[in-house]
Amino acid sequence: MTQGKASAQDVINALNLEPHLEGGYFRRTYQADHRDWLETAAGPRYLMTSIYYLLTEQSPVGQFHFNQSDILHYFHLGDAIEYSLIHADGSLQTVVMGNDVLAGQHLQLHVPGGIWKASRLLDGKNGFGLISEAVSPGFDFADMEMGNRQKLTTAFPQHRALIEQLTRDED
């Protein structure tokens, strides 16, 4: 970045990001065009894809969603981002990605396929948090399910308050 404090809009413009379905902003930066496709139960997929993903004060939540593929997250800059992961057995895991490793924040996070995941920007001085994701097999919208509030609260009633915060009201 140039001298001075970058705003969320500066980062959106510099990286050519666009609004994401789950919240925040993104841009696909890589797909393994030079590799053979992987055959999956849902059809052929790239071996790997990667995106930039940005949460901002104006769009601070990545809504609960479910991916079939494994995803590696890499923190780059800005404010910390809290991830809420609901496993199939109903257990909840909370991980904070950020650059303060001495405070227990993580620079990398692996989320296996088959876990409900949501993220939210934590308060900080920047007004945004930027990560990258590497997805294998490569991301395809057919392999992703957005979290339905009623379905998730029925399946995981012990996490009702969190689910209500991190899903859209479909009514």
Stretches found by the model and what they are:
Residues 1-109, 119, 124-126, 137, ...:
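Non-catalytic, conserved peripheral segments adjacent to functional cores
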Residues 110, 130-132:
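A structural signal for short, well-ordered beta-strand segments and their strand-loop junctions
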Residues 113-114:
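Extracellular beta-helix/beta-solenoid repeat scaffolds
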Residues 132-134, 138-142:
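N-terminal segments that mediate ammonia production and transfer
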